[in-house]
Amino acid sequence: FFPGLLVVFVTWLGARLAVQGELTPGELVAFYGYAAFLVLPLRTTVEAIQKLTRGLVAASRVIRVLRLEPELHSPAEPASAPGSKAELADPASGLVVPAGELTAVVSAIPEDSSALAARLSLTADTDATLGGVRLDELALDTVRQRILLHDTEPRLFTGRLREELDPTGDTDDATIYAAIHAAAAEDVLDALPEELDSEVEERGRSFSGGQRQRLALTRALLADPEILIMDEPTSAVDAHTEARIADRLRAARAGRTTVVMTTSPLVLDRVDRVALLVGGRVVATGPHRDLLAEHAGYRETVTRGEEDW
């Protein structure tokens, strides 16, 4: 834009001076030639300044990230990790999650269930325990290896979809496709020109909210942690898709500990046990249908979620 504007300005000014007799036609042609010669260097300079500005902004952001200090650290002398199939418990709410079961937590206040998910996964200050050992007394790497939090705002990054779903690159295609099936994301994959080798745009902008949620769920299932905690994993999908996910999730996580924060009847009807959270405390536990019949507060919370559909 600016180089072109320079040529227009020089031509106009030169023509005006030539008409007034202050510039000869030969001088005008020569001056125009000089201006045209400067167009390419000027354009290159402008582009370089723009790229330098963007680079400086990006560098400052990277530096800010690199300077961040993690809020959580491993203790100086970590406690011994409990064995597999350990019970997960949160004294603050009274929730106890039996090992190997699919447990749901229902709360009328989403912030309460999200806070519980953060405590159970040691992404916030907590006195939660695994096998009777406080999470914050275990080595942080051990906790991250054994417990995975799938939060409400899934994030996708730029790159190939295969690398997005399987960052380690250790998983074969058959296992990846099985996880995609469990997350009911086959239609998302089918719509991509190169399927698993398709490029994902920044933040997954080419996908809808429901598609991003299912791809992130696929990634969580492929991680295959001992304990998977999911905060509203189906909030952005339609009822038919949610029902398929609920059915397949149970099979995909069979024998492993899974906690789902949700108010969806479609999911609740397929879990082993439901815990009702009121005011941040567990006030009732049991099968979905029993709580639906016996507990008015539970019935009101779940029915409201059903009406939202």
Residue spans of the language-model regions?
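Hydrophobic alpha-helical segments in the permease module
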Residues: F2-P3, P25-E47
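Cytosolic ends of transmembrane helices, especially the final helix of ABC transmembrane type-1 domains
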Residues: L38-R67
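Primarily ABC-family ATPase nucleotide-binding module
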Residues: L66-I109, A251-A254
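C-terminal portion of ABC ATPase nucleotide-binding domains
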Residues: P75, T263-S264, D269-W309
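ABC ATPase nucleotide-binding domain helical subdomain, centered on the C-loop/LSGGQ "ABC signature"
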Residues: G83, R162-E201, E226, D247, ...
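ABC-fold ATPase nucleotide-binding domain signature/coupling loops
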Residues: E186-L215, R219, M230, V237, ...
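Conserved signature/switch motifs of ABC ATPase nucleotide-binding domains
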Residues: A223, I229-M230, S235, A254
